Amino acid sequence: VLTGQSVQSIFQGNDYWKVETNHETFSCQKLIMTTGSNPKIWEMLSEIGHSIVSPVPSLFTFNIKDNRIAALMGISAFANVKVKNTKLEASGPLLITHWGMSGPGILRLSAWGAKILAEKKYQFTIQVNWLNDSTFEETLDLLKDLKLEHSKKIISKKSPFEFPNRLWESLT
């Protein structure tokens, strides 16, 4: 690893590459460039025939303006999250924050779906499955069974599932 070096030029020969920095010149047969967001390097690569895909933000939380989750700030629970009308889906701990949702699953969606979400101008609908692997129909059947078994109880008082009671109270 070399530090304090700045790429000055890139040359592509028939079977080699030459990279000139502010301190020395390197030659190699194969070259991998990790440019980050350096427009100077992008321009150099464009000059030798490469195209640069416009960068978009990645690894971001979802800003959700919805009163239904406002009272749930601080709750964390495992969930499966889908971005509707796409193939984007991820599971993991989901954290409800003061301005939306975060956590490993959300960050994974924002990373793998960065281009798709940017194309949607960050306006999209998510579907959160708090029961992870259960389908809608399976969940509905389970809730009907619980209703029959506990018909005389107030269902909002105790969650029959493995997630926080405050979340259950909000859902009921």
Each language-model region and where it sits:
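Short, basic, helix/turn surface patches
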Residues: 3, 25, 77-87
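Short loop/edge segments at beta-strand edges and connector loops
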Residues: 3-5, 21, 54-56
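A conserved short coil-to-beta-strand element within the FAD-binding core of flavoproteins
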Residues: 3-16
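Short hydrophobic core segments
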Residues: 7, 19, 24-38, 44-46, ...
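Glycine-rich nucleotide phosphate-binding loop and flanking beta-alpha elements
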Residues: 9, 38-40, 103, 113
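Short secondary-structure boundary/hinge segments and terminal tails
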Residues: 10-12, 62-64, 100, 114
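Residue-level recognition of phosphate/Mg2+-coordinating polar/acidic sites
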Residues: 20, 82-172
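Central beta-strand plus flanking loop segment that forms part of the substrate or channel wall
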Residues: 40-41, 46-81
